[in-house]
Regions:
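Helix-centered, glycine/charged polyanion-binding patches within enzymatic domains
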Residues: 8-19, 111-177
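Generic secondary-structure signature for well-ordered alpha-helical cores
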Residues: 100, 166-169, 195, 199
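Charge-patterned, long linear interaction tracts outside catalytic cores
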Residues: 176-202
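Catalytic-loop motifs flanking and including active-site residues across diverse enzymes
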Residues: 90, 156, 160, 182, ...
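Polybasic low-complexity intrinsically disordered regions
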Residues: 1-124, 134
Length: 202
């Protein structure tokens, strides 16, 4: 299979006609419904390796669970994808799913979600996006003090992930196939939800 020639940089020459830039998945998700966007995402079991920001190799095998969690550590929307899929690719459909289920104001996300379409969709839904800036090798303006205080609430998402792995069986998944893996993880999510509700009312 021949690879397409790379897109030329800079201004086009006089009379030169260039193909329009290919629409990215995030740009496409802006006009799609949550169901349409999720249908495009890969859900196969895959294997891969990459270098992280510190230069160390990270490997993965299997699937990745994405969750939208409220400030009480209750999961509102959950989706399973291939492990190699970048977190930002699931942000927009999860925001749309959650907005259909509950009313909320702030979208708190880490630097992996620092992308223009995500900001745009968040504002279109009537939310306030507070997303940590991805420096991409450049200096960034720090968050305003009031945003930094609100951003601390994002720790509940990390707490949810930690509890799901350590207390509710997501660390060791001993089944194969996307349906069985999803069922295994969703039992853990339901149990965590019930446990958290009991903690809140007691």
């Amino acid at each position: 299979v021949e690879k397409p020639s790379p897109r030329k940089k800079g201004r086009p020459r006089r009379g030169e006609v260039r193909k329009p830039k290919t629409e990215s998945r995030l740009e496409r998700q802006c006009r799609q419904s949550a169901a349409e966007a999720l249908a495009e995402l890969p859900v196969c079991c895959d294997v891969g390796t990459k270098k992280n920001s510190q230069g160390y190799k990270e490997s993965w095998r299997g699937y990745k669970l994405h969750a939208d969690v409220n400030d009480c550590c209750l999961p509102i929307s959950v989706e399973l994808t291939a492990a190699s899929l970048h977190d930002s690719q699931v942000a927009i459909p999860l925001m749309k799913m959650t907005s259909e289920r509950v009313d909320y104001l702030y979208d708190l996300m880490d630097a992996a979600y620092d992308a223009k379409p995500i900001y745009e969709v968040s504002r279109t839904l009537g939310h306030v996006p507070i997303i940590d800036k991805n420096s991409r090798g450049k200096d960034v303006i720090p968050m305003a003090p009031h945003e930094a205080v609100r951003y601390r609430e994002r720790s509940v998402a990390e707490r949810f992930n930690s509890r799901l792995k350590e207390e509710f069986g997501a660390r060791n998944v001993m089944v194969r196939g996307v349906k069985k893996v999803r069922l295994h993880l969703m039992f853990g999510v339901i149990a965590l939800f019930a446990d958290q509700v009991l903690k809140l009312i007691s």
